C-alpha cells in the first residue's frame, strides 16, 4: 500500500491525529506514519538550545538565525524517518506548522514525496495576511502545567481555529487532549 506521513503543529504530539481518521486511511491500504517532531512528546529534546521566541520569529522580516533549528532541519528529520523505515517515498501531509514542514519535505526531498497535503498552513511568505489577533493569542499562549488547564487551552484553540460549519465534539477533544497530556506533556515544544 501507499505510505502516508503525517506531521503536526509546533507543540502538538502525534496523538492529535485522530485515530478514526488514521484508521480509515489504513483500512484503504495506506501505511500511516505519525511521529512527534523535535522537542515534542516522546521525541528528542533540545533543552540546551533554549526556547525560541516563536511569536517574534513569525513577524515579517524577523531574524531567524537564533533559532535552535529550522523547518529545513525538521523536514530532514522526516525524510530520515522514511529512510530508517526503509521507505522510498510517501504522501506527505501536515497541519499548521506541520503543513510547513510537509511543504519543506516536498521541495527538499522531492523524490520522497508522492503528493503534498498542506492543511490550515502557510508558505511562510511574509506578504500573506497574518493570522487574526485572536488566533495568534490562543496559538502563542503556552498552556498551564496542570492537566485541566492544558485541556482547556486545547479547547480554546479548537474553538478559535475550527470551522463554525463543523462544531467540535468537546468531550472527544477533552479525552484526546487528556491522553496527550498523560503521554508526554511538553508545553515548550517547538
Model region roles, listed by residue range:
Residues 31, 88-91, 112-115:
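Structural signature of beta-strand start/N-cap positions in the alpha/beta core
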Residues 57-69, 135-144:
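Short glycine/proline- and acidic residue-enriched helix-loop micro-motifs
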Residues 59-90:
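Conserved acidic catalytic loop of the alpha/beta-hydrolase fold
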Residues 74, 92-94, 119:
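Short beta-strand immediately N-terminal to the catalytic nucleophile in serine-hydrolase-like folds
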